[in-house]
């Protein structure tokens, strides 16, 4: 009201609220109620039963895994937790993408028209990341008719090949299939190609489809390491059944031209959906500057495909032998994790409209 003096800040601080005016009974009074056999006063007054959902939750920060943040957390006995760094949060996000669920099974074909650009190495790299981070089964199939070397990248645990798997009429369980595969330290399994060049060349589209029908029953992610020839019989089945392509290129001009020619051929032969969904991998074959400006290659392939990733040179990968993720340089491993996360972004897509099965 006009002329009425406003309360001072001290009065705001000490003024009783409506809830405070309903004074709670003194603890001594409650004690006397119990002593006299009287029922204690019920809370809350409105008779609503409290729920655990009403209790505010405080989520503890995750402990940092590296750097000065981890040192501070360790030295303080956990009393001081700076939280995870931006890099650790980014890695956590990549891992979550890689671990997202798959609709049934997911099939990835890795291919290149040019040999020696790291196709088999990339197949092993992606597969190893998936197998080590995910909890389900991941397998790579060697469909190279020209004496594929995929099985040389894992400890050899069996002499079986795709041909032996096809001839086995007693496959009823995962254990029956496992007898035909070798497994890397990452948990990635490999099904070897036929070692006889004549028999390998005769590996047909129908036989590839039969192999996939078996593997689909027991594996969540199936990678196929293709040969360099697009006209080989099995390639028709590979391209028809693949959900996504990983196209391998080197940073040299001839490698880039071969990758571009592969995209052209796929588009002309009814696989334009695979081109649009393809992930291009540019492998750097040696230390130092690449022969072609990487940014120009990125721009060219991004205009046609879903993503482009560059994998740095790594001496362990260059050995061409068994791949151990623990021996990779941290930058190489990070690049492979990012590549796997990009491929995994397509896991939730419904590919049934593209045919296959």
Where do the protein language model's features map onto the residues?
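NTP-binding/hydrolysis catalytic cores, primarily Walker-type P-loop NTPases
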Residues: 320-357
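Phosphate-binding/switch loop-helix module in NTP-utilizing enzymes
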Residues: 185, 190-232
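Conserved C-terminal guanine-recognition region of P-loop GTPase G domains, centered on the G4
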Residues: 259-275
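Walker A/P-loop phosphate-binding motif and the immediately C-terminal alpha-helix
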Residues: 90-94, 104-145, 151-153, 167, ...
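Beta-strand-loop-alpha "switch" segments that mediate conformational coupling across diverse proteins
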Residues: 284-329
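Phosphate-binding loop that captures ATP/GTP phosphates
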Residues: 132-189
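Extreme N-terminal, non-catalytic leader segments
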Residues: 2-109
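Inter-motif core of Ras-like GTPase G domains
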Residues: 216-221, 232-253
